[in-house]
Curated annotation (Swiss-Prot):
Protein name: Delta-theraphotoxin-Hm1b
Cited function: Gating-modifier toxin that potently and selectively acts on Nav1.1/SCN1A and Nav1.3/SCN3A. It enhances hNav1.1/SCN1A currents and delays fast inactivation of the channel (EC(50)=11.6 nM), leading to a sustained current. Similar effects are observed at Nav1.3/SCN3A (EC(50)=11.8 nM), but with less sustained currents. When tested on Nav1.2/SCN2A, the native toxin decreases the peak current by 50% at saturating concentration, whereas the recombinant toxin only shows a weak decrease of peak current.
GO (cellular component) term, any one: extracellular region
More about this protein: Shows high stability in both cerebrospinal fluid and human serum. Half-life of the recombinant toxin is >40 hours in human serum, and >70 hours in human cerebrospinal fluid. Negative results: does not inhibit Nav1.4/SCN4A, Nav1.5/SCN5A, Nav1.6/SCN8A, and Nav1.7/SCN9A sodium channels.
Length: 34
């Protein structure tokens, strides 16, 4: 189960495709890919 945009995360692996974990704020943000 992946985390959606603004979902809590520890690493990018926690986030859905095209999202990366912001480790300063610990949420999934768009990584700029389509």
């Amino acid at each position: 189960e992946c985390r959606y945009l603004f979902g809590g995360c520890k690493t990018t692996a926690d986030c859905c495709k095209h999202l990366g974990c912001r480790t300063d704020l610990y949420y999934c943000a768009w990584d700029g890919t389509f």
